[in-house]
């Protein structure tokens, strides 16, 4: 019996000389793995099995991995591939969401997050900001929730008083907390406030947000440290992005 599902390709792996195993995230937020037979030697599927493609997949599946029958492309997100930075940030977003979900998990929000992020990357020049926002939105999927709203040290909720982020207290903190946690990460007040806004804003509202590059740099550094400290997931495309930026700075 054939099944139909709309989804976005998030992973593809060569299998033998002729075949591909592709994984797509469907609208219900479920990862579906399919064998695409002879996909490496045939033009049957066109480019529809490439990363970022949103397709209507037709496949057979009883238990375990299914077998792909055909794909009908809805959106190729072609523009993402025209810029190496945008493409790598898109790969980062895909990998981050993929790693956050168990193979049998259902999470419609993850699909919506991925779809909106790719659409915005395709239509704007904010790939790095979009990736930052997705990084923040994905943290709860990994079981970690940062606190940019108030200081758990003293309950202070006045944003203009925050000067650092404390891993010890897992929250923004004021000057007083530095006595207890001298290793809190110093941050500009503005970047901490922007992190609070980004953690609260729906991703659909991203197109209306403009943030200066220096703040994005500062926020990204903190978010990466949070992933290293609390989540511990290795994202290959993040390392590639860091290497690319180092090369640009060297030039």
Swiss-Prot record:
Gene3D superfamilies: Nucleic acid-binding proteins, Recombination protein O, C-terminal domain. Keywords: DNA damage, DNA recombination, DNA repair. SUPFAM superfamilies: ArfGap/RecO-like zinc finger, Nucleic acid-binding proteins. One of its GO terms (biological process) is double-strand break repair. GO terms for cellular component: bacterial nucleoid. The keyword DNA damage applies. InterPro entries: ARFGAP/RecO, DNA_rep/recomb_RecO_N, NA-bd_OB-fold, RecO, RecO_C. Involved in DNA repair and RecF pathway recombination. HAMAP family: RecO. Belongs to the RecO family. This is DNA repair protein RecO. The lineage of its organism: Bacteria, Bacillati, Bacillota, Bacilli, Bacillales.
